[in-house]
Amino acid sequence: VEHLTEDEKSQFRAAFDIFVADAKDGTISSKELGKVMKMLGQNPTEKDLQEMIEEVDIDGSGTIDFEEFCLMMYRQMQAQEEAKIPEREEKELSEAFRLFDLDGDGIGDELKAALDGTGENVETWEVDEMMADGDKNHDSQIDYEEWVTMMKFVQ
């Protein structure tokens, strides 16, 4: 909870209060969590709901109090941030591919020229091997999908 801003805590308090409006004890049970998940288009099983609660149930009560709710929301925010990282990587891969693919037909000769231009002593057979490994449809070019697949193994 200490990682949250006052504004985030305030927003989470408002959401928490909606969650517990029907609850007699002021905490979120699997029943309340299930209702909200269904409103969000999810259809978790009772087991799924219990596991979600257990992940943040610090005091072992079987329900989620406000502090535990904040922990759950903070973890959700972190997961969303981490999900953005592949988007940035995808954008970088796309930009790199565009830089290599000068004539718009995929990269083949361009890859060889780019590797030669690095100043590294890259042997022709090494470039040929990279092309053979990356060129899944055997058209002597690396298209964008093949490029992305190839780069995943590089990282």
From Swiss-Prot:
Q: Keywords in UniProt for this one?
A: Acetylation, Calcium, Metal-binding, Muscle protein, Repeat
Q: Does the keyword Signal apply?
A: no
Binding, Ca(2+) 1: D57, D59, S61, T63, E68
Where do the annotations place Ca(2+) 2 binding?
Answer: D135, N137, D139, Q141, E146
A Gene Ontology term for the protein's cellular component: myosin II complex
Which Pfam family, any one of them, does this sequence belong to? EF-hand_8
An example of a GO molecular function for this protein is: calcium ion binding
Q: Which InterPro entries match?
A: CALM/Myosin/TropC-like, EF-hand-dom_pair, EF_Hand_1_Ca_BS, EF_hand_dom
> N-acetylvaline (modified residue): where?
V1
SUPFAM superfamilies reported for this sequence: EF-hand
Here the disulfide bonds are none
Domain EF-hand residues, every copy: 7-43, 44-79, 88-121, 122-155
Function as written in the Swiss-Prot or TrEMBL entry: Troponin is the central regulatory protein of muscle contraction. Tn consists of three components: Tn-I which is the inhibitor of actomyosin ATPase, Tn-T which contains the binding site for tropomyosin and Tn-C. The binding of calcium to Tn-C abolishes the inhibitory action of Tn on actin filaments.
The family classification in the record reads: Belongs to the troponin C family.
Q: What name does this protein carry? A: Troponin C, body wall muscle
Species of the source = Halocynthia roretzi
